[in-house]
Curated annotation (Swiss-Prot):
One of its GO terms (biological process) is cytochrome complex assembly. Heme binds at H123, Y127. It comes from Ruegeria pomeroyi (strain ATCC 700808 / DSM 15171 / DSS-3). GO terms for molecular function: heme binding; metal ion binding. Belongs to the CcmE/CycJ family. This is Cytochrome c-type biogenesis protein CcmE 1. Its main location: membrane. Keywords: Cell inner membrane, Cell membrane, Cytochrome c-type biogenesis, Heme, Iron, Membrane, Metal-binding, Signal-anchor, Transmembrane, Transmembrane helix.
Amino acid sequence: MKSLKKQRRIQVIILATVALVLATGLIGYAMRDGINFFRAPSDIIAEPPQPSETFRIGGLVEDGTLVRGQGETVRFSVTDGGASVPVVFTGVLPDLFAENQGMIGTGRYVNGVFEASEILAKHDETYMPKEVMDALKEQGVYQAPES
């Protein structure tokens, strides 16, 4: 009698373990496209990512680099004070997008140019994404907003 109970308990434990491993695998598979790592321009210049890798870049839109091209194509550079990365984006920019303002872009780094598929701009004059703020502090160019 006890051996039957023990055998049933082992079967339940094995089944639960298999279900847990399967669920973890499915969650990881579903999230594979949703995970985008953040990189500062200095990180990109130091170690350029593969052209197939999608990631986020953040920093300040470099002054004097914003050029509107044909149609909705926009070119500009993003800097963290230590390095600058050229960006090309085709689409409608957020209303708050401007030079010397914080931004985060999602896309790929191909042939020395970040090809953005999405651009996010800061919310107001005091907001800056944490990753961008940390990168600017690391470069020594971050200035805290005056209250």
